[in-house]
Design a protein with these regions (language model features):
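Positively charged n-region of N-terminal signal peptides that target proteins for export
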Residues: 1-4
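Hydrophobic beta-strand core positions in alpha/beta domains
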Residues: 56-58, 88-90, 134-135
Length: 167
């Protein structure tokens, strides 16, 4: 009897964890919140200025090890698909934009890096793990969201990007 109760307790715990994970809020299917952020070149950039293009927004932080892995993959994607209508934007959520800039310089990426030092934009995008990648379609709707990064995730990004570029 006791073993049965313990087993039921574990099963209920597993179900509650699974339910809570599936209930994580997402912006997929909703309009992407617009933002204006300062870029590394000193200009303010707005998401809305890229309306009509597919936009990959990657939220990252220098303290998130997965960001260091993901950025070169995103740079390759940017190089390959930029002329086809893809815009890649990296958004640092580090509080210290100077240290974030040093990190971005060291990563040598060819896409614009923006600074969200107050994390206000990150909150609007419901960030829950770093890095986080969002794909926005040509009409400004969030179509894909991925939290965290492991090698191979960029293949899922590519599938989504190709589909959005065909639309």
């Amino acid at each position: 009897m006791r073993k049965t109760l313990v087993a039921c307790g574990f099963a209920m715990s597993a179900l509650l964890v699974a339910a809570s994970l599936s209930a994580v809020p997402t912006l997929v299917g909703k309009p992407a919140p617009d933002f204006a952020l300062r870029s590394m070149d000193g200009k303010n950039r707005r998401l809305s200025e890229f309306r009509g293009q597919v936009v990959l927004v990657n939220f990252w932080a220098r303290w998130a090890g997965d960001s260091r892995q993901e950025m070169p993959a995103l740079d390759r994607i940017n190089t390959t698909y930029n002329r086809a209508g893809l815009v890649v934007l990296g958004v640092s959520v580090d509080e210290d934009w100077r240290r974030a800039r040093e990190f971005a310089d060291a990563m040598k990426v060819g896409y614009p890096i923006l600074f969200d030092t107050t994390a206000d934009i990150g909150r609007n995008y419901l960030l829950r793990k770093m890095p986080m990648t969002i794909l926005v379609d040509r009409s400004g709707v969030v179509r894909y969201s991925s939290a965290g990064f492991k090698s191979g995730d960029e293949l899922a990004y590519l599938d989504e990007i190709r589909e959005l570029l065909r639309e």
